[in-house]
Amino acid sequence: MVNDKARRSVIQFEDVSFEYSGAETDSIHHISLDVKEGEFLVLTGGSGCGKTTLTRLVNGLGEQFYEGTLKGRITLLGRNISEYPLYEIGKKVGSIFQDPKSQFFASITEDEISFGCENYGVPYEELDRRVSSAIKRINGDMLRGKEIYPISSGEKQKIAVASVNAVDPEIYVFDEPSANLDMYSVEALKNLMGGLKAEGHTIIVAEHRLYYLTDLADRFLYMENGSIKEEWTAGELRSIPEEKRRAIGIRAADLHHIEVDISPVKEKDMTMEVKDLAFSYRKHPVFHDVSFQAYAGDLIAIVGHNGIGKTTLSNILCGMQKEKEGQIIYNGTKVSKCKRKNFAYFVMQNTDCQLFGDSVEEELLLNGKGSTQEQRDDLLKLYGLFEWKERHPATLSGGQKQRLTLAVSDWIDTPVLILDEPTSGLDFKNMMRISEHLKALAQKGKTILIITHDYEFAAMTCNRVLHFVDEGHVETFPLQENLSRLYSCLMCQ
């Protein structure tokens, strides 16, 4: 590796603080940072610690798009970043956001990938080459020519990465890039990042999941309350004692040291039975002959590759979509689509679709009429949201929004609770908080189904696995003594 002193600085923060309009305190404060050309930097820390704000300042959005006050100086490639027009920063700094839909402009995958190049006037022949190369990098041949809306969240994330890759900026900024990806796709993302690093690109990643970055990152910066508190190499990160890692709330650096943290549930009353379920989208089969049973107290991890139909199955179970064939039986009775909402509640992956209040507390009031102030406060404290009770949900971080939707689900007393990627955007502390709460609900007899790609979370939370092997075939197995099988299921998707 070239000595840092011999490499030019591409990004410099000099005593930088930033406060969003309406906020009582700075989101980040007194940050001083020097990022060298070709460096791979990872920002980690608890939800709301300032990681996303720091990335917004690197790509120019913090000062030029979001309302707020910036103090200090940010230098990008030798110039004060405030001197650049935003479109010029976009050529130099490519951004992949936590919610990929927020950066889409086209309805077809290849149109989206080419959109940035077209805006910068890239000649057609070169544009076609870049688009093909970007699709190859994300292993996305199956996504060519597809409409963006119906593809899965993980596939949307891939398209976002490809669209930035086609522009070929010098600096890449990723905000929680693995949040919606299965483990196989995370490996593909890792390889993509490794290729970018080998080409000399500077890469900044804000991330909770760290295991896939330890072979790539030059530095890990741990943030807390808007400040950089610690800095580690990959070796130092792996050497952090388990007690300290849990205390500061960071994810595992090595998945092979994770153990099952839940006992098998003794078979109780059957809550739900699915028989020969089939579904098609625009005459294209999504799955068929899906059958399984779920019991009171079950915590079932639903796994399978992106786009195989896990979310569609959940939509059908709670009455938001109708199956083509098959039966869904709750408590021994076949239930029609319109009545399923009384039996199953679905916490969606896209939390914005379920948040309607003008404040965090009002969100609870909309769903918990008749609740007392003490009950609402206790629930917000349980999910670590009490100090944000007056904040508008739109101003929360991704992890905070996720916890709010879970808090709302507590008011809805259905025998079955279904969650779609509940740990997306969560740090270790909040992942543990969610895990312990779901286990407490299961102990009370609730049946819980969790769509997840998160091996660490599934190992500490679930007792059974429902694996979509391929379209039309599922298998179930107990997680106890089958942890390696779960790992294989997630890695071979």
Task: State each model region's role.
Residues Y172-D175, L417-D420:
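Catalytic Walker B motif of ABC-type/P-loop ATPase nucleotide-binding domains
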Residues E147-I151, E155, H392-L396:
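Conserved ABC ATPase signature
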Residues T44-G46, V303-H305:
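The feature captures the beta-strand-to-loop junction immediately N-terminal to the Walker
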Residues E125-L143, Q373-W388:
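Conserved ABC ATPase "signature" region
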Residues N59, C318:
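Helix-to-loop junction immediately C-terminal to a conserved catalytic motif
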Residues E67-R79, G326-R340:
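Conserved ABC transporter NBD signature motif
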